[in-house]
Design a protein with these regions (language model features):
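Transmembrane helical core of 7TM receptor-like proteins
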Residues: 1-309
Length: 309
């Protein structure tokens, strides 16, 4: 069935973060700066990992994928949002809306599992260091990443397919991008299946990775406490702290958005929460991993030194 026949609506209007005219230009400047920092930070980290052979390890392979996802993630909706700040009519086509929503789902879900794979990598490195190179082989790392992307692909297809079956009678999306919760509000057909699907799939994709990460760090903490060397403990804590910060920020904001009861907060609260995991976290990731990682600092110094000479 053609997309035009699937819905009474052929385009949507994105209401944005706020309808106050005085805030449009300041918000445009803030999010433009944020987007530039996010893009340059993640791109720099990707290039740093590619150009430095001593960073070609499982840990940085996962970090490379995380930065790649964050780079794509922020580019899915930020350019459109920036345009909407300066345009009078914030229109997005039906096809464009569904495409934006699909890639948003794909990238967010993939990131959940990439972060889980990173926790497993730290578990093997600290709890089973003698077997690290055997367990975290290039083949194993590739399988973990392929699995992360496949889960993201299949779940995004499921959610997008569910939206394509709906008939939309209204077109004002109370959000700055095509997000599933405000989209369901516009349907004039039953959204019960979509809501159940959202709760089950989002619950699975947040709770299962969170449990796996908690279990991994439970074993890691146990191993660290058994270490007799203070230097060893300090190095282990330093290695894991960046990942723990990123996981807490990302999973916490996603859980608040998708697992809270629908009556406990308005769509405006959802906008604020989504700004956090869509914009703030991708911007913070390269900064957190760079500032707290000795290997990245050394690699950056080498690159800067080479450029001077």
């Amino acid at each position: 069935m053609a997309l035009e026949n699937a819905s009474l609506v052929t385009e949507f209007i994105l209401m944005g973060l706020t309808n106050q005219p005085d805030l449009q230009i300041p918000l445009f400047l803030v999010f433009l700066m944020t987007y530039m920092i996010t893009t340059l930070g993640n791109l720099a980290l990707i290039l740093l990992i590619v150009l430095n052979s001593h960073l070609h390890t499982p840990m940085y392979f996962f970090l490379f994928n995380l930065s790649f996802i964050d780079l794509c993630h922020c580019s899915v909706f930020t350019p459109k949002m920036l345009m909407n700040f300066v345009l009078k009519k914030n229109v997005i086509s039906y096809e464009g809306c569904m495409t934006q929503f699909y890639f948003f789902c794909f990238l967010v879900i993939s990131e959940w599992y990439v972060l889980t794979a990173m926790a497993y990598d730290r578990y093997v490195a600290i709890c089973n260091p003698l077997f690290y190179n055997v367990v975290m082989s290039p083949k194993m790392c590739s399988y973990l990443m392929l699995g992360s992307y496949l889960v993201g692909f299949s779940d995004a297809m499921m959610h997008t397919g569910g939206l394509l079956r709906l008939t939309f009678c209204r077109r004002n999306i109370n959000h700055y991008f095509c997000e599933i919760v405000p989209l369901l509000e516009l349907s004039c057909t039953s959204t019960y299946v979509n809501e159940m699907q959202l709760f089950i799939v989002a619950g699975k994709n947040i709770i299962v990775p969170t449990l796996l990460i908690f279990i991994s760090y439970g074993f890691i903490l146990s191993s660290i406490l058994k270490m007799s060397s203070t230097a060893g403990r300090s190095k282990a804590f330093s290695t894991c702290s960046s990942h723990i910060i990123v996981v807490s920020l990302f999973f916490g904001s996603c859980a608040y958005m998708y697992l809270k009861p629908s009556s406990s907060g308005s769509l405006d609260q959802g906008k604020i929460s989504s700004v956090f995991y869509n914009i703030v976290v991708p911007m913070m990731n390269p900064l957190i991993y760079s500032l707290r990682n000795k290997d990245v600092k050394i690699a950056l110094k080498k690159v800067l030194t080479k450029r001077k000479f």
